[in-house]
């Protein structure tokens, strides 16, 4: 487990074919209702493939009508949890080992994104402060700015 702390943690944009123009670089930790936006929204056409930002193990998938809608949680090196939300489809399952080339889902507008432009909400949580991070007392969680981690 300790060796996992020292493996690479640099990530790729998880939405296939998307670059810096697909998200607002100031959206991380931007005021969002009664809290802060804990990640970034990457806008793309509905159905665009979503890849893991970095390889890891899928620890959970969920289909719900509120919040993140169809979502996936992947554990990676550095003890980081990568959250992918508002997916139109989930193409993986809990326990799957995924690489950057795997397709885990498709961009969508599920959950509280219904009726809004299709996008992937992507965030990174951790138990170890690393890089550009913020503490969220509401969830007692450390969130890392994904933009600063992308290659």
Q: Could you describe each region identified by the protein language model?
A:
Residues 1-71, 100, 109, 146-151:
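Surface-exposed, glycine-biased beta-strand/turn segments
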Residues 6-14, 93-100, 118-151:
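Acidic, glycine-rich catalytic/binding loops that coordinate metals and/or anionic ligands
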Residues 44-46, 89-90, 94:
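Active-site acidic-Proline motif in GNAT/NAT acetyltransferases
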Residues 47, 77-79, 110, 125-129:
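Solvent-exposed coil/turn segments that connect beta secondary-structure elements
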Residues 52-91, 117-121:
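Zn2+-dependent peptidoglycan hydrolase active-site motif and core
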Residues 103:
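Glycine-rich acetyl-CoA-binding "A-motif" of GNAT/NAT acetyltransferases
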Residues 107-120:
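Active-site loop architecture of trypsin-fold serine endopeptidases
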